[in-house]
């Protein structure tokens, strides 16, 4: 069988794919992405409601009031949990539970005395924040 120019043109990409080494199963290829760390300026006493422990997640969309209003209207966001820093907080169950899952910020009281919470201390659990 003779190779025609059409078959030769089709065979070249196939050979290129077959010659590419595959990543072994179980080994993930590490791809570095140039992402600048985001800074969130929080006043912990005002960003997290007092009286409870809270897990907080940063919401970039909330910086746009039109989008935030639309999300609240659609019932996607709870307006009571959104503050001016663009952070939405949800309460943790008592007693002091510090597992925030995939949230960005953990908030806990500086003085963990039940009934006497002077301010909340929010710390980042996301290295990009």
Curated annotation (Swiss-Prot):
The keyword 4Fe-4S does not apply. The keyword Secreted applies. Aerial growth, conidiation, and dispersal of filamentous fungi in the environment rely upon a capability of their secreting small amphipathic proteins called hydrophobins (HPBs) with low sequence identity. Class I can self-assemble into an outermost layer of rodlet bundles on aerial cell surfaces, conferring cellular hydrophobicity that supports fungal growth, development and dispersal; whereas Class II form highly ordered films at water-air interfaces through intermolecular interactions but contribute nothing to the rodlet structure. CDD domains: hydrophobin_I (cd23507). InterPro entries: Hydrophobin. Self-assembles to form functional amyloid fibrils called rodlets. Self-assembly into fibrillar rodlets occurs spontaneously at hydrophobic:hydrophilic interfaces and the rodlets further associate laterally to form amphipathic monolayers. Disulfide bonds join 48-106, 55-100, 56-89, 107-122. It comes from Pleurotus ostreatus (strain PC15) (Oyster mushroom). Residues 1-19 form the signal peptide. This is Class I hydrophobin 11. One of its GO terms (molecular function) is structural constituent of cell wall. Keywords: Cell wall, Disulfide bond, Secreted, Signal. It holds the Pfam family Hydrophobin. It is found in: Secreted; Secreted, Cell wall. One of its GO terms (cellular component) is extracellular region. The lineage of its organism: Eukaryota, Fungi, Dikarya, Basidiomycota, Agaricomycotina. The gene is Hydph11. It comes from the Eukaryota. Belongs to the fungal hydrophobin family.
């Amino acid at each position: 069988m003779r190779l025609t120019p059409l078959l030769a043109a089709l065979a070249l990409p196939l050979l290129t794919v077959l010659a590419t080494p595959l990543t072994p199963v179980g080994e993930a290829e590490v791809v570095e992405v140039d992402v600048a760390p985001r800074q969130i300026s929080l006043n912990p006493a005002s960003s997290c409601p007092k009286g409870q422990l809270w897990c907080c997640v940063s919401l970039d969309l909330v910086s746009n009031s039109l989008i935030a209003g639309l999300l609240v209207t659609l019932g996607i966001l709870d307006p009571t949990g959104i503050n001016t820093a663009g952070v939405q907080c949800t309460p943790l169950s008592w007693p002091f539970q510090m597992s925030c899952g995939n949230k960005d910020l953990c908030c806990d009281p500086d003085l963990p005395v039940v009934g006497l919470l002077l301010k909340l201390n929010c710390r980042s659990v996301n290295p990009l924040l």
